[in-house]
Amino acid sequence: MQQKKHNSIIGWGISLLTMLIFMASCHEGIFYHSYQPVNPTGWEQNDTLVYICPQAWYAPSCQLEIGIRHKDSYKYRDIWLIINTDTVHLYLSDSIGNWKGNGIGDTRQWSAPIHLNSFDQDSIKELRIMHIMQDTPLKGIEHVGIRIKETP
């Protein structure tokens, strides 16, 4: 009798844990989220990161976020990118040098919503990202990601 009660509690606990994990993994409205690694020796200006979405999305009804994972040793407070034909300027730290975003160890991750002017009327399936910083290779950037979600 005691064993059955113990097994029932364990079964209930496993079910609850599974449900919580499932709920945490569901992000409503997100239909594309991907990070790509940058060459560990540095990001060359001609190294283009290409993101091919599984389905085309219409920019006015979606929100695009760009995410950057970088080392604390990244020597700039900002980064300039070209996304398809738009130039994007992102600040990775505030005016006194405090990194934005969160991190573990010496790696930080920060993301921000962006608006791409060239996409106002188009259906988009592919995004191409490259940096336009003067340093080449650009050191300290580990991953660049995008997240696309429907706006409510």
Task: Set out the residue ranges of the language-model regions.
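Exposed low-complexity, polar/acidic, P/S/T/G-rich flexible segments that act as propeptides
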Residues: T85, Q134-P152
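An anionic, turn-rich surface loop/hairpin at beta-sheet edges
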Residues: H89-D120
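Bacterial signal peptide processing site
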Residues: H27-G29
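Short coil-to-beta strand junction motifs in C2/discoidin
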Residues: Y74-I82, I141-E142
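Short amphipathic, basic-aromatic surface patches that mediate peripheral association
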Residues: I66-Y74
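Post-signal peptide N-terminal segment of mature Sec-exported envelope proteins
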Residues: S34-P54
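Noncatalytic modules at the cell exterior or secretory-pathway interfaces
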Residues: Y58-I66, N117-D135
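C-terminal motif of bacterial Sec signal peptides marking the signal peptidase cleavage site
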Residues: F22-S25
